[in-house]
Amino acid sequence: MKRVLLVGAGHAHAVLLASLAQSPLYGARLMLVSPYPRQIYSAMLPGLIAGHYRREEAEFDVAALAARAYAEFVPARVRSLDAAVRGVTLEDGRELEYDVLCLNAGSTPQDDVPGAREHALAVKPFERLVESLFGSHIAIAGAGAGGAELAMALRHRGCEVTLYSEQPAFAGALGLRVERALRRRRIDFRPGMRVDAVEPGPVVIAGRARQQFDRVLWATGPAALPWLATSGVAVDEHGFVRVDETLRSVSHPEVFALGDCASTGEAKSGVHAVRQGELLAGNLRKLIAGTPLEPYERQSRALLLLTCGARYAIAARGGWTAEGRWAWWWKNWIDRRWMARLREQKKSAVG
């Protein structure tokens, strides 16, 4: 009986657990470690903030999903990983051993700017963000898809929003549509302006300008979780786990890495993580059975649906872009279908 340890309840592991709830993984003892028994689905976070969804519509029960997949749920954070001895240490001091380790623990916003960690509110974890989000004048550092969607969701809620973007997050027609959407909603968009520091207040320092806000949200690009660097698992220059074509660690084949914490060559997106989770569901069965694993087919032209506060969205794939209310309803259908899958009761039982 192989001990399979799942760290994190991101998109990939959610898909994996939903699959195992329908068809159990025989020959394995599963354990899931994640800090939150209930988790907000990231794609529905802007809609939750904008008021289009209730909290219960935008979150799923991690503990219940694990139970349906016959996995033991451990509500805890990871302190360290020692790949040499195949052990994970939790923040409360407990130690867990594994035969197979699957990492889908996400990332953290880059917070190397002075004062960002102390005086700004990181976008992740979403649960803490939603519980701590208040104020009428909010600054957001980072104008990627997450930052832009948050800015427009908060503006829809009536907040004054200033959005700082050091570098263009989108190119071409998509970039023009996003910037136009921000301007139309009277968001104070400041492209090419880096946040140099955050001081108590909170006060944002950008160049020679100093401005006080009720809240500063930190939505910059993803940074690797610190404990990966000391794990012994091979990582890339940014600290993300290097994986082969089957999403296994190049240094430790008993370790899988998926989603934000993996270095796959793709953009760090939930769309890709979902596909990785579907592959993992099949490859864990193959690993237990001792048969060759399937390779992951990377996707260069994933669909992007970016919400704009109201029930309106921008759609893009490759060089094609469009926008309208229809795009929001399309995204709403996709997201609700996803949540329904995570809540679906199992159709099979262990005999």
Feature map (PLM): residue ranges:
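Beta1-alpha1 glycine-rich phosphate/pyrophosphate-binding loop at the start
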Residues: 1-71, 149-173
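FAD-binding core/adjacent interface of flavoenzyme oxidoreductases
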Residues: 3-4, 68-137, 217
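Conserved N-terminal Rossmann-fold NAD(P)-binding element of oxidoreductases
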Residues: 7-9, 103, 141-142
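A Rossmann-like FAD-binding core segment of flavoenzymes
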Residues: 73-81, 88, 96, 158-245
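FAD-site-proximal beta/loop scaffold in flavoenzymes
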Residues: 116-136, 202, 210-275, 282
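Rossmann-like NAD(P)H-binding beta-loop-alpha module
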Residues: 128-164
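A conserved FAD-binding loop/helix module that cradles the flavin
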Residues: 261-309
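C-terminal auxiliary extensions adjacent to catalytic cores
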Residues: 310-351
